[in-house]
Amino acid sequence: MKVLFTFLAVAIMTMATLPLKAQQKEAYVVVSNNGTMITFYYDLQKANREGTVCQIEGTSPAWIGTLTKPNTQIVTAEFDKSFQEYRPKRTWRWFFNCSALKEIKGMENLNTSETTEMVGMFSGCKALTSLNLSKFDTSMADNINNMFMECEALTSLDLSNFNTEKVTSMSYLFASCKALESLNLSSFNTKNVRTMGDMFAGCANMTKIDVTFLNTESVSDMKGMFSGCSKLTSIDLSKFNTERVSRMNAMFKGCKSLTSIDLSTFKTTYVRNMDEMFFDCQNLTTLDLTKFDTRKTTSFDDMFGQCKELNTIYCNDKWNCPDPNNKMFDGCEKLKGAVAYNKNSTGGVMANPETGYFTRKTSDGIASQTTSHIATIKAIYSASGQKLNELQRGLNIVRMSDGT
């Protein structure tokens, strides 16, 4: 009987301890009762927390805003010290469209050493004025698309600790960061990056962007890369490798302060889309496109549209534009090549140096006039109206090939 009692006691104790042993720490977010604060935890206390508890793993974050409805309540976010032990595989949209968020505390408690996807993490945080990324580990990240997009109040970002060695996609990374004045990208390793579309689009406060550190040998998409950088006054693209790029549409669209762009190193052999590439570059006066190969390009819509100060486009080739009425030169009022600009002739048919708006450039860099459009003598007459075979001493009446 004593043995049986002892056995039952041990069994009861074992059963009592099983739930405790079976429990595992869990990562979760608590939204405060008034909705103004979210806290990230990794512990066993989820059932005891006050507020709305949200899951992190395997779900779209329940606390964030949506594309059509931002979260305008959350003002503060904090990573609790317990969160140090958690290793998220993705931080996808963790603060997406939290448009009133002003502060993120405890970033040192966020361990991203195993995080591969950081898409849209801070996108739409329009009130956020600073981010402490000094402990941020991006060594495993392969996708950082939209990460800081529309962080409209950020004036600076310290990215010196960013390891981008495995990143393949950076599209919209800093898009619409309207207050950013500068970026130091010297720590960026972009040898594996394939997409940089709209990477700096809408960075309207930057006067200069140093992209000489960017390795673009694998990049195929540069669509809208600098679009809307309206204060950008200069850019050094001498290190850009564009051999694999297929999309350059809207690449410099709206760069209203640029007066020149050196594209002498650009290879456009595989580029298919150049729509709006220089659209609304209002202060560009000259473009040298003599190195451009457009044999595979199929779309040129509004390529030079509204370049109001553009007077010369150097190019020795006739471009084959599938749509001859694509408004390629619309609004280029000062443009003159083989012929002067005509507002009624703005399509791709004018993309040539023979009868269009391109200007030939010789190997020594000197612009040459198209010989077929140099006026020649068609007929010679004496003062009395008699037709002559050659110019005579005295008064001659000469009829030229251009009608003069």
Features from the language model and the residues they span:
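Bacterial Sec-dependent N-terminal signal peptides
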Residues: 1-23
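C-terminal tail/sorting-segment detector
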Residues: 3, 397-404
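Negatively charged
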Residues: 20-363
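A short beta-strand micro-motif
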Residues: 29-31, 380, 398
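Acidic/polar residues in short coil/turn loops that connect beta-strands
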Residues: 132, 184, 382-384, 402
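Residue-level detector of functionally pivotal "anchor" positions at catalytic/ligand-binding pockets or at interdomain
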Residues: 361-384
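C-terminal trimerization/auto-chaperone modules of long, extracellular attachment fibers and adhesins
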Residues: 386-389
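Extracellular Ig-like/FN3 beta-sandwich strand-entry sites
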Residues: 393-395
